[in-house]
């Protein structure tokens, strides 16, 4: 008997079996990589980010299925699920049916208001579409590497919401006015936009300024400009937007700050061995080599993004430059904001 054809057939069968396993292995490796990134963020950028008390479950959506990492008991009672991987403290389940029919997810979601039987009532869940589904909605996302930075941004919102004082403040005082309202003011009111763009430039100038006296003058000019805009808005519209702007600026600015921290981390990070084997969309952080913030204007310019993302991001960077501690205070006291902490010192 000729053994060569049999060996070739066996090799092909093993290869086919590996191909069948690969899609699910890729999912597991991606989820595990995200959890390892949380550890990196805690070590390098935001202490307590990976603390178990602030963890939120992750729901990963393909086009036809859902996987959930570390779900709550309520989730498992709501959705029939099978444990498909256990790795240390991480348990990944596959739901029998897709959790919902939405074609795209990249958000931390929860249900607020009157009590409901919903699985995520007062219980935030990070929900993300797979890389393959994400690029259908956001074509500019070029790799699994970039996709994971978006997930960590949203995961940080879960971290914020897991602080009960912050959750209570957000639900009782803020959620009634959604971020889209502030965005509309920026887009529809030229004077409002002009002032915000100028405020943001003052923050950028203060970050870049080396002279401490001039830095203080720039910060005071920022306060004067902001105070005038808010007063003018209240006079014209009979509505104070101060607390909403401060809250969303802190919420989104710090999430962007954490996302940005990964760009710097990826510049020197070694490729993940598991993803190299299972995920052809993993590009070994190639985009982030020799990373330069100035090229990503959408991170820090108000006219390139939702404005309070940029002002919040820049305010966090200014606090870093000034050596003012803020990370241990935010979210533990529900209403305290980046602006409040900067005002205490300047």
What are these regions (language model features)?
Residues 1-24:
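Bacterial Sec-dependent N-terminal signal peptides
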Residues 19-97, 255:
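N-terminal mature-domain "stem" immediately C-terminal to a signal peptide or N-terminal signal-anchor/transmembrane
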Residues 83-142:
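Active-site scaffold of zinc-dependent metalloenzymes
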Residues 139-140, 238, 306:
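Short consensus segments that form the blades of beta-propeller domains
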Residues 139-147, 170:
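Membrane-interface helix-loop-helix junctions at boundaries between adjacent transmembrane segments
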Residues 149-162:
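Active-site recognition of the HExxH zinc-binding catalytic motif
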Residues 162-234, 241, 245-271, 275, ...:
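Post-HExxH zinc-binding segment in Zn-dependent metallohydrolases
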Residues 241-268, 282-344:
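Active-site-proximal alpha-helical
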């Amino acid at each position: 008997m000729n053994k060569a054809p049999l060996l070739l057939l066996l090799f092909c069968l093993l290869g086919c079996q590996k191909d069948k396993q690969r899609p699910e292995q890729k999912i597991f490796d991606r989820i595990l990589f995200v959890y390892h990134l949380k550890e990196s963020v805690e070590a390098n950028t935001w202490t307590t980010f990976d603390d178990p008390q602030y963890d939120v479950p992750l729901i990963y959506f393909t086009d036809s299925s859902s996987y959930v990492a570390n779900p709550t008991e309520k989730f498992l009672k709501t959705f029939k699920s099978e444990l498909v991987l256990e790795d240390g403290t991480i348990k990944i389940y596959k739901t029998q049916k897709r959790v919902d029919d939405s074609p795209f997810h990249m958000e931390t979601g929860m249900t607020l208001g009157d009590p409901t039987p919903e699985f995520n009532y007062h219980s935030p869940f990070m929900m993300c579409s797979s890389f393959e589904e994400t690029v259908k909605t956001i074509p500019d996302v070029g790799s699994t590497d970039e996709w994971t930075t978006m997930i960590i941004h949203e995961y940080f919102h879960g971290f914020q919401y897991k602080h009960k004082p912050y959750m209570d403040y957000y639900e009782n005082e803020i959620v009634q006015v959604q971020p889209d309202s502030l965005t509309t003011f920026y887009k529809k009111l030229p004077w409002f936009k002009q002032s915000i763009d100028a405020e943001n430039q003052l923050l950028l100038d203060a970050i870049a300024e080396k002279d401490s006296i001039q830095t203080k003058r720039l910060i005071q000019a920022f306060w004067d400009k902001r105070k005038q805009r808010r007063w003018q808005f209240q006079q014209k519209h009979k509505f104070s937007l101060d607390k909403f702007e401060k809250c969303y600026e802190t919420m989104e600015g710090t999430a962007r700050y954490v996302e940005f921290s990964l760009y710097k981390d990826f510049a020197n990070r070694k490729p993940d061995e598991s993803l190299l084997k299972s995920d052809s969309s993993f590009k070994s952080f190639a985009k982030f080599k020799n990373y330069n913030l100035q090229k990503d204007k959408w991170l820090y310019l108000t006219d390139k993004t939702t404005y309070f993302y940029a002002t919040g991001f820049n305010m966090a960077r200014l606090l870093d430059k000034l050596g003012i501690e803020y990370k241990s205070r935010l979210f533990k006291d529900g209403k305290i904001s980046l602006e409040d902490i900067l005002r205490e010192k300047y």
